[in-house]
Amino acid sequence: MDKTPGKVHTVSIESSACNETFDVQYYLPKSYSDLYKYNVIITFDSQDFFKYGQIERLIEKLEKTEEIQRTIIVGVPYPSVEWRKHYFNPNGEHHENFVTFVGRELNSFIDNNFSTLKMANSRLLMGESLAGSFSLSTV
């Protein structure tokens, strides 16, 4: 697994809950070191957060000015608009399995591969539109 800090990486994660593979993006800050523990932001619709929102640049700026503590970003991109309906919508056919993937499998992957704080208040879920509703509904 590539832990080069300061760039967005992609890794494939097998989900037994969803019976499929997810390409997950992650960003380690330029100052990343396994010697420190990090908060985690999990973004849904992550390709939009990285490409248009440049979330990694914002996090770097906020860390530098000490407005936030050390943070890594992990994101789940959506392959299509139709996919979002099935996974993010509470009535979607894959919604419950996706909640299980995020809660158990994705969080386990994050904690097993990165130096993270393992407390509920050290995690943030975020998304836009339907992904934002999903984030709020899984808290």
Question: Language-model segments: what does each one mean?
Answer:
Residues 1-139:
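Non-catalytic cap/lid and distal C-terminal segments of serine-dependent acyl enzymes
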